[in-house]
Structure formats: structure tokens, C-alpha cells
């Protein structure tokens, strides 16, 4: 069996059997996101887990934080990248789904533009600097402060047949009552990742911008695992 190699992404390099908790620079330092990177001792796939694509969806964000806190490197095959909140500035300003500077929703802008507005440039950075490194993608969401919803999971539905099939298989592992096949290929982060050949899902759990430890976060952690 081939030995696990150091995992390199941007300016970061993580050795097998080690975990990194800190910041990842994107677009040559124009954006900085809080991440945890777990590089297992054994080779395997690279899984990307993101939260805070919409910064007011706190259940997904806390689930990513808790997963990074409790994940044991000894149990990891391959590499797991956890981005705890992509829209860091919007999270800090309680801006919800919309960009502070341009009023745009990141989850409507993929694949983004290299020379676009701030949100478009962030989408472009994620699509070109994160997605090429990963084999599977899980995006954690929840209902914003104006959204009531029943827990469900989207899986990518506009991609190559094998990508759609694997996305559905991933979705079937999530403990929610409903599963929805997406009908778009761009705009959303997971939709665009699938168009690049990456099986992807989006989990929705929690509502109204509320985080209650009596309900959703632990189940999201389990679903991500």
C-alpha cells in the first residue's frame, strides 16, 4: 500500500498523523478562513467540510467547530479539511447570507470571478484553490433567522452519472427525513463542486438562526462523519 504523503494546500503543509488548527489564506491573502486539517497516517480520500457559506446559519458553523474539536486523528484515513466559517467577515458583522461589501449571497455566485466583487472573488478562490484538492464535499447549512425548515439533505444532481450516484450514496448516510436531488449545476458551492467531478451534498438542519444543543449540532457531527 502506498504511504500517506504530506498534505499541501496553499501555504499549509500537514504531515501524516498530524492535525493543523489555524488559518488558511486564499487568493494570496485576500481572504483568510479558520480551518482544521487532519492528515491521517493511512492514505485515502480527501474530504472537504465547509460551514458558514451563509454566515447566519449557526448550526452548521457550530457543527463544524465541534467536529474539528472532537475528531481523532488516529481514526482518519486520507485527509479531512474543515472550514469552520467561510464568510468570516459576514459572521463577525452578523450579516446573515449577504456580503458586507457587495450584498451578494456566496451560495449563488459559484464559480465566481477572479476580477469580480468581493463575494464573486471569494467564490472563485474556493473553486480554484480548495476544490481541486478534494474527492468528496459536505456543505453544512441551517435555517437563517427568517427560515423555518424540516431537516433535509440535498445531493448533487447535475453532474456526471457516477458523481450523482456517489452524491446520493453520501446523502443516504445522513440522519434526516428528506433527501432532495438538486437540479442546478452552478450557483451553489456543492453544485459547482459536483460539476468539477466531486461528489457533494448539502445538509440543512436547524432553523430561525437558532442553535440549541438539545437538538441539531450533535446529529450534524454524526452525519458529517
Could you describe each region identified by the protein language model?
Residues 35-43:
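Short beta-strand-to-loop junctions in surface cap/lid or active-site-entrance loops
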Residues 213-225:
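Single conserved hydrophobic/aromatic residue that forms the stacking wall/gate
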Residues 1-30:
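Short glycine- and acidic-rich boundary segments immediately preceding or forming the N-terminal edge
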Residues 44, 58-207:
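Active-site/substrate-binding loop(s) of hydrolase catalytic cores
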Residues 54:
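Conserved phosphate/anionic-ligand binding catalytic regions in large, soluble enzymes, centered on
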Residues 51:
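The conserved beta1-alpha1 loop
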Amino acid at each position: 500500500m502506498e504511504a500517506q504523503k504530506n498534505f499541501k494546500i496553499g501555504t499549509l503543509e500537514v504531515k501524516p498523523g498530524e492535525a493543523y488548527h489555524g488559518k488558511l489564506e486564499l487568493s494570496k491573502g485576500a481572504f483568510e478562513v479558520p480551518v482544521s486539517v487532519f492528515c491521517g497516517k493511512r492514505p485515502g480520500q480527501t474530504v472537504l467540510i465547509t460551514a458558514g457559506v451563509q454566515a447566519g446559519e449557526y448550526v452548521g458553523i457550530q457543527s463544524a467547530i465541534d467536529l474539528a474539536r472532537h475528531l481523532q486523528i488516529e481514526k482518519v484515513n486520507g485527509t479531512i479539511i474543515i472550514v469552520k466559517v467561510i464568510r468570516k467577515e459576514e459572521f463577525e458583522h452578523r450579516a446573515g447570507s449577504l456580503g458586507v461589501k457587495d450584498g451578494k449571497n456566496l451560495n449563488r455566485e459559484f464559480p465566481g470571478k477572479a476580477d469580480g466583487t468581493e463575494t464573486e472573488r471569494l467564490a472563485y478562490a474556493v473553486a480554484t484553490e480548495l476544490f481541486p484538492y478534494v474527492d468528496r464535499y459536505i456543505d453544512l447549512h441551517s435555517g437563517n433567522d427568517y427560515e423555518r425548515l424540516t431537516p433535509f439533505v440535498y445531493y448533487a444532481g447535475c453532474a456526471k452519472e457516477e458523481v450523482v450516484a456517489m452524491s446520493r450514496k453520501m446523502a443516504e448516510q445522513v440522519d434526516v427525513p428528506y433527501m432532495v436531488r438538486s437540479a442546478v449545476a452552478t450557483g451553489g458551492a456543492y453544485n459547482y463542486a459536483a460539476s468539477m467531478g466531486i461528489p457533494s451534498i448539502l445538509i440543512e438542519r436547524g432553523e430561525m438562526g437558532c442553535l440549541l444543543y438539545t437538538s441539531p449540532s450533535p446529529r450534524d457531527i454524526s452525519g458529517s462523519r
